[in-house]
Amino acid sequence: MTEPGSTGSVTISVHRRKPSSMTQSDQHHRPGSEGEHYVQEVLGTTDRADRFYRDQMLDHLNPAMREFIARQEMLFIATADLKGECDSSFRAGPPGFVHVIDDHTLAYPEYRGNGVFASAGNVIQNPHIGLMFLDFQRERIGLHVNGRVKLTEDERLRSHVTDLPLPQVPGQRALMWMVVQVEEAYIHCRKHIPHLRKVGADESWGTDDMMRKGGDFFGAKQEREARERHSPSPTAAATGWL
């Protein structure tokens, strides 16, 4: 059986269970994507998924979720461009660096970083975003938040949200904020979340020191330079000096 809309290259070779009794209207009102509903139907997990949707998935941030986010120092994010090409990234800051504005809205800052702005560039084309908060230290639990993003300049957002957190480094303001309109919020179970402890390392907020930022840890620059040393320059090739 091939996945709907595929070219036939993705096949789920299991026996399909009897068609669901759900109507098109029922399917339309279920949380989640059409693709996940299809896989649930094929693998026979629709009832199990519906229990999770019913018991754990909200379209807003309840008080427990808001308090949880306010304690977090790490955030994993996922975005995709107009073609659906994906990018995952990581953000970190002191507790409260992700600011819950209200039950349906949160925001986190975007700094210059390496200057690429892959996540910001993606959401200009495709505003959907997935956030993952994982508490490794205290609760050993996770929180998914999915929604739509608007990029907002720092000064403009501060004029409307007066309790927005101050910069992590004095004098270094965010260039912009990712303002997320929450569409889904739900638990990530603790079953395989390890218990970690902080060792008091210097976070080096805002540093431009390449070594403190990790330098060329994976050797990508070294690899490029080695390749260039062993490749003839365009000028040499054009003049025949090889």
Language model features with spans:
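Binding-site signature for planar aromatic cofactors or substrates
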Residues: 12-242
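Intrinsically disordered, low-complexity segments enriched in serine/proline and basic residues
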Residues: 1-4, 9-11
